[in-house]
Amino acid sequence: MISAAWSIFLIGTKIGLFLQVAPLSVMAKSCPSVCRCDAGFIYCNDRFLTSIPTGIPEDATTLYLQNNQINNAGIPSDLKNLLKVERIYLYHNSLDEFPTNLPKYVKELHLQENNIRTITYDSLSKIPYLEELHLDDNSVSAVSIEEGAFRDSNYLRLLFLSRNHLSTIPWGLPRTIEELRLDDNRISTISSPSLQGLTSLKRLVLDGNLLNNHGLGDKVFFNLVNLTELSLVRNSLTAAPVNLPGTNLRKLYLQDNHINRVPPNAFSYLRQLYRLDMSNNNLSNLPQGIFDDLDNITQLILRNNPWYCGCKMKWVRDWLQSLPVKVNVRGLMCQAPEKVRGMAIKDLNAELFDCKDSGIVSTIQITTAIPNTVYPAQGQWPAPVTKQPDIKNPKLTKDHQTTGSPSRKTITITVKSVTSDTIHISWKLALPMTALRLSWLKLGHSPAFGSITETIVTGERSEYLVTALEPDSPYKVCMVPMETSNLYLFDETPVCIETETAPLRMYNPTTTLNREQEKEPYKNPNLPLAAIIGGAVALVTIALLALVCWYVHRNGSLFSRNCAYSKGRRRKDDYAEAGTKKDNSILEIRETSFQMLPISNEPISKEEFVIHTIFPPNGMNLYKNNHSESSSNRSYRDSGIPDSDHSHS
């Protein structure tokens, strides 16, 4: 009795436990009706949702909620109870604040393409295990990031803030960050403290900002000892940055800036660098030995720069020829002087560098105010046409000296013709200047009609190349300082000199353009050689045709009279063509006579008959009928062959 009661008690206990566990199992396996659930992956994307649906299974690990219309009010508070969720995709929604109520253990959060404006400590502190944060294409600004917002994000490795409204790099970023993307913002300055302590940073992308050389702090990248990739594409740099971390840097991208010079120490100690890209800049020469420390370089890309292949670039030719096969260098193509335009620097002979040329120097003195120091925003100056080194070309320039009133500042200017349409202007300043205005005008043209061209050059520059001028034409070049130090000039009257471009006939380039350069059309004011040759051939052809026609017309009537039969053998088909009618006989031609042999059954006579040829040699008719009224059944062709079946001797 006791055992039976005990059995009933155990069965009741099991039933009770089953009833308690059953709802939990059903809940764990439930899925929102608007979503699709598959082994921890919850697919609620692209459904025009305005809020996150309830009833998400507790064993969910990844939530796909992108491409909806979810706003901040649509994030339920019970979402934070999903403790197994590690990845949430909420991009392309309608969030305007950093979302709260997120699962505590989320590691990867995608919030791109929303309208998030603020990042607070309260929102980030609730997800302390976050490793990847994607905030691209939002409205985050530097002032909208709360100070210390990331102080508890000790696991954050990737922070993407591309295409926002940042003007500076946010302070207080966690030391654990390995990749930081800040491209396409409005960053114009980077101070050293903003990147201080980011010793784990490996990849830094700053493309498409407003950075210039004055906006980069001294040694701003120097302490990033683990940095392997630095990208500064599409900024306003005029010189390559210096003091780069040399321990681990492997990739450096500087293309699409306004770089016109490379400091001699720019790439010092970058022994691990294997890819360097400086394409689409304004480089015309490189300081000697600039690549000496690049022991591991394998890809050097320098396309679309106005390289001036003068004496200062001869060392580059020697360096290129000494490189091993594994090193791939692209874009070192001469753009000037004209005689080597389109040629690869590596292929130039030593004589083409003109290392013995000398220039002609003109001196200009101007009066300026008391110097102080004011630096305008760099990067706002227009990109120069082409900057060239001090390559000298004798016999192409004239001395022009203009002297102003006595002053405390002297500018020494060199003006010389480089090609028939290019002049090179260089200058030296005794005292620092912030900016100068450079202009040029073809003499004989009125400035009122827009023929004058001017540009602003920074005080850091010392030379300028003016292109697209007219050959053998006089030009007036003027220069005036816009600012010296902190005070404006009392007198901004420009000081001008006159120069002259070289004649076109002095340049006759015979080079072949490289594949990467567009071939220029051949320009020649004279009649093209091909047209002359074609015309001559046409005239000769017409003359020959006329001569042939005249000859045929003259000799056509004599053709039949001059024809004579060959003494050789003729095929039987030739007789048919000549009008000969064949009988039951075989004609056998023997030299100048032929023999007729009957093929009848009668015995052949032993007597040999010889029939002489009746064909007259001159092709005239042999038979004449003096009686026109009498008819005849025989008639002769013009060739003397009778139409009858028998020949007559």
Curated annotation (Swiss-Prot):
Residues 550-649 are cytoplasmic. Glycans are attached at residues 226, 282, 296. Residues 1-28 form the signal peptide. Changing residue 69 to K: In HH21; the patient has a second mutation in the HH-associated gene FGFR1. The keyword Amino-acid biosynthesis does not apply. The keyword Protein transport does not apply. Changing residue 47 to A: Abolishes ADGRL3 binding. Residues 29-58 form the LRRNT domain. One of its GO terms (cellular component) is glutamatergic synapse. Disulfide bonds join 31-37, 35-44, 309-334. It comes from Homo sapiens. Residues 387-407, 622-649 are annotated as: Disordered. It is linked to Hypogonadotropic hypogonadism 21 with or without anosmia: A disorder characterized by absent or incomplete sexual maturation by the age of 18 years, in conjunction with low levels of circulating gonadotropins and testosterone and no other abnormalities of the hypothalamic-pituitary axis. In some cases, it is associated with non-reproductive phenotypes, such as anosmia, cleft palate, and sensorineural hearing loss. Anosmia or hyposmia is related to the absence or hypoplasia of the olfactory bulbs and tracts. The chain crosses the membrane at residues 529-549. Keywords: Cell adhesion, Cell junction, Cell membrane, Cell projection, Developmental protein, Disease variant, Disulfide bond, Endoplasmic reticulum, Glycoprotein, Hypogonadotropic hypogonadism, Kallmann syndrome, Leucine-rich repeat, Membrane, Repeat, Secreted, Signal, Synapse, Transmembrane, Transmembrane helix. Residues 305-357 form the LRRCT domain. It is a single-pass membrane protein. It comes from the Eukaryota. Residues 38-67 are annotated as: Interaction with ADGRL3. LRR repeats lie at residues 59-80, 84-104, 105-126, 129-150, 155-175, 176-197, 200-220, 226-247, 248-269, 272-293. This is Leucine-rich repeat transmembrane protein FLRT3. GO terms for molecular function: chemorepellent activity; fibroblast growth factor receptor binding; protein homodimerization activity; protein-macromolecule adaptor activity. N-glycosylated. Proteolytic cleavage in the juxtamembrane region gives rise to a soluble ectodomain. Cleavage is probably effected by a metalloprotease. Gene3D superfamilies: Immunoglobulins, Ribonuclease Inhibitor. Residues 409-504 form the Fibronectin type-III domain. It is found in: Cell membrane; Presynaptic cell membrane; Endoplasmic reticulum membrane; Cell junction, Focal adhesion.
